[in-house]
Amino acid sequence: YYIPFDLHYYSLLYAKYCPEDKRSITFIKRSTIFSKSFMLFFSNSGNAIPFGRSLTYKFAQVAFWSIYSNFIEDKEVLSVIKGIIERNIKWWMSQKIFDSNGFLNIGYCYTNQFMSEFYNAKGSSYWCLKSFIFLLNSSDYFFKIDSSKLENKNNTRRYIPAIFSTIMFHQGHSYMFMNGQKCNNEFGNTEAKYEKFLYTTHCAPCVCRSVSGIENLACDNSLIIKIGQSFIIRKNSHILENNEHVMVSEWKPFNDVSIITYIFPNVPYHYRIHVVNTKISFKLYDFGTAVCKNNSLIKSTKDNKAFCYNTNQISGIYTLFDNGFSSICDCSPNVNLQYPKVVIPYTCTNFEKGKHYIVNCCYNGIAEIENTTKIQVKTDGIFYENVFYPFKETYFPNNSLYSKAIQIARKLKTIISYFK
């Protein structure tokens, strides 16, 4: 969120006070293009997709819309923008964002140090005050106009190559399927904040509080390998293919194991196919979306399908073709950014030396479970929605020229695809 509330924000602030500069026109054009995609980050309830490190800043999520409103003359567009701002601030005011002294806390929807960064301090959350820059609007028009509900975005699908994601909208919620975003630095829990399969307004992601046990790792919408008593979280995967219909990545936790994952973005159901090529034995956990653990929670593992229900959330995952088993993880307290207590459905499969594949079906929604599109997995690829996707080549890297050539070719392909 530092992209909208910093880079675009200050560019528009410059454009507001230096309109004679030619660069100001460029800044406004860039923000207009950005706004088309950024609008999809917000649910009908007002909350935005929890993604990245810049989450303790609360309703700074709408700071971009506050400054952008200065440049909008169209009544309908301005009404939509005002609605986004109002709903987001109201949603935040309904969360536990104040401490016992009345100050904004460090955390997302409640005080939570597990998700914080080393640079956070008591005043960090007050970046949210940047959102009140709409008070600088030169006319009273913004304040007099009625705020509108969001336009009907149901079943919207948009691929955004700049953030390696496909965003979809369903039943009033936003879903961002992610493949390729990395943050290889000293910040905490980067694999949780950037590298999960899915981020959604349906439920915020979880962060790890300990490397002992899946209840402490809390890897919603991600993978875990277990070898003996050691756990390895999916991180630093490589993009093999990215578009609005399929996302393919390869994760190599070490040289003896390769897991190529095919994700077909869809809601409320989506498929994850994991092609495993291994020289050792291990367990593979695949987790669905977290669900608030409250008094209305119902857990079910009937027919080897793990589903969690409460009043306004449904999350489930199961394995096709009877591979492995499905269960539900009761997570340790305070791992989730939105709820102090959550549960996560998951599948677990044992793999021996060799090449294997597993097909998992995930559900995320707020209403009754709907029928899912059929998928076929063959020895040479996947057939889904009348399109055949051949399996990608797996290779184990070494110091040979062939291995180095493949690595260079893959990087070039990724760069070319990005600029296309």
Which role fits each region the language model picked out?
Residues 1-149:
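Extracellular polysaccharide-recognition and catalytic grooves
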Residues 15, 48, 60-63, 121, ...:
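A sequence-composition feature that detects small, non-aromatic residues
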Residues 16, 22, 29, 36, ...:
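Context-gated lysine
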Residues 17-35, 78-88, 133-155, 187-217, ...:
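Contiguous hydrophobic segments
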Residues 123-293:
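Non-catalytic C-terminal accessory modules of carbohydrate-active enzymes
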Residues 215-419:
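Extended repeat-based interaction scaffolds and adjacent low-complexity, acidic/S/T/P-biased segments
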